[in-house]
Amino acid sequence: MTLARDAVLWAADHRWLREHLPKYRFVRRSVRRFMPGETLEDAIAAATRLRERGLPTMFTALGENVTDLSDARRVVANYRDAYDRVADAGLDTEFSVKPSHLGLDLDPEAALANLEELATKAAERDNWLWLDMESAD
């Protein structure tokens, strides 16, 4: 692993940094190319601009390691809504999700059911669902 990658992964595991670093303007400007906003509306607006340039996009909801299954269900509901809104906007946008964001660390069977639900939604909308690689300690 590289030093930069190790630093980013270390920072991602620290709540205080996740909550406070985005408040700094230089941090927001540094990540804007990869994360053009904090809402689905921001992402759709950026994807629309990129579509005009012929560029496909990928959406992911930031976060992982939910602390209870109701949080995982909210994640699923948000992705389902995003699939519908992206299809309605006619965007060439695919989605990726982290298994721990669907509750893998809490209940593997519930996480699998959540994953199957999202895969079904992706198929209904003629789209894709990509799984992000996560740490395997």
What are these regions (language model features)?
Residues 1-129, 135-137:
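Alpha/beta catalytic barrel-like cores
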